[in-house]
């Protein structure tokens, strides 16, 4: 916990520490959900198929602020007033140029290593809680179910404080009252924009697991469609 968050456990929000289960059980899985799995071909092909539609245009490597701007509670898209829905999933402080200060996050560095042997640690994920600089090692073949592989590949995760530098990714919001107060300032700026929805870890400054995030996204889509039906 101290390595991951850079704080003492007593200084960390119970919302965070409460995510780590302590179980007396013969079930040694981290999650206790009845159904668990990963996409057969991986997440990338799954998302590629989801986005492969004539009504969807994907642009990567584009800063949304190059296409969107906000003036007097009006959204402009490519310089033209836009009255449709915008679902924003990025960092909310960065959308508003961090004008109140940067929201604190923890980031991660991933170091991949390959070994010419059948197994490295014998399990998919092992947490390292003592003197190592990394917090956990993932050995992928135990997640994918691959057999007869040419060696084994692992990744070590090294946590550090997010600074906004190029190449860094904000993974985990640091849930403290002062940080929540700062987030609320940014949320107030977004609150006056019509049909502008905040969704996800960054936009909401919350921690979500993928199943909860998927459910939240589907609920938002249903709510938007229901609202459009009323208009």
Specify the residue positions occupied by each region the protein language model found.
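Active-site/ligand-binding neighborhood in enzyme catalytic cores
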Residues: 1-85
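Aromatic-acidic/polar surface patches that form glycan- and anion
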Residues: 36-43, 126-127, 206-213
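Conserved beta-strand scaffold positions in the cores of enzyme catalytic domains, especially
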Residues: 58, 86, 153-155, 195-198
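Active-site catalytic microenvironments for nucleophilic, acid-base chemistry
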Residues: 53, 94, 223, 227
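C-terminal catalytic lobe of FAD-dependent flavoproteins
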Residues: 169-231
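Conserved beta-strand termini and adjacent loop/short-helix elements that scaffold enzyme active sites
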Residues: 59-63, 140, 199
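Mid-domain catalytic core of redox enzymes
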Residues: 66-189
């Amino acid at each position: 916990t101290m390595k991951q968050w850079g704080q003492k456990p007593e200084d960390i929000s119970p919302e965070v520490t409460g995510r780590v289960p302590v179980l007396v059980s013969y079930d040694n899985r981290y999650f206790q959900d009845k159904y668990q799995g990963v996409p057969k071909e991986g997440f990338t092909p799954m998302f590629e198929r989801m986005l492969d539609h004539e009504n969807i245009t994907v642009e990567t490597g584009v800063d949304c602020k190059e296409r969107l701007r906000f003036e007097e509670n009006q959204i402009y898209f490519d310089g033209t007033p836009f009255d449709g829905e915008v679902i924003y999933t990025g960092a909310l402080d960065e959308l508003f140029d961090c004008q109140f200060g940067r929201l604190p996050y923890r980031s991660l560095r991933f170091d991949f290593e390959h070994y010419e042997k059948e197994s490295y640690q014998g399990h998919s994920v092992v947490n390292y809680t003592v003197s190592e600089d990394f917090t956990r090692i993932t050995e992928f073949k135990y997640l994918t179910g691959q057999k007869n592989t040419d060696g084994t590949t692992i990744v070590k995760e090294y946590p550090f404080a997010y600074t906004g530098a190029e190449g860094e990714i904000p993974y985990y919001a640091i849930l403290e009252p002062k940080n929540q107060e700062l987030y609320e300032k940014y949320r107030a700026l977004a609150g006056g924009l019509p049909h502008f929805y905040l969704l996800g870890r960054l936009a909401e400054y919350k921690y979500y697991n993928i199943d909860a995030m998927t459910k939240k996204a589907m609920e938002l889509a249903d709510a938007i469609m229901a609202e459009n039906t009323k208009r």
